[in-house]
Amino acid sequence: MPTIRDLVAAIRRRDGIDAAVVLGRDGLLIDHQADASVNAESVAAHVPSILQYAEDLGASADRGHLLTAVIEYRSGSAVIAAMSADAFLLVLVRPTADLGALLFDLRRHRANIAALV
């Protein structure tokens, strides 16, 4: 059976991925693989506040629980995907990456990913 480490490694092998990070709702790292230029602990520490605001928005807009958030920056994107109520996957993506394919795969394999936690 695949593990969280296998998931992180598989995502990291995709073209254009700078980091794949699995973290708890509290922002603490569970597992990660990242380029040397990415401070995974620092990046993960910012995710809980983003999650809180995104979930508040979803509640106010009557959209339900957060499944995936995509934040686009000038130099790439950050994708945050819920693995369970207490674990999240953060993927840092370069502009050259196939973001659509990544999002499709995360959605298609959501149940399998959730089973890893």
Q: Where are the regions a protein language model picked out?
A:
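Non-catalytic interaction/Regulatory regions outside core domains
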Residues: 1-117
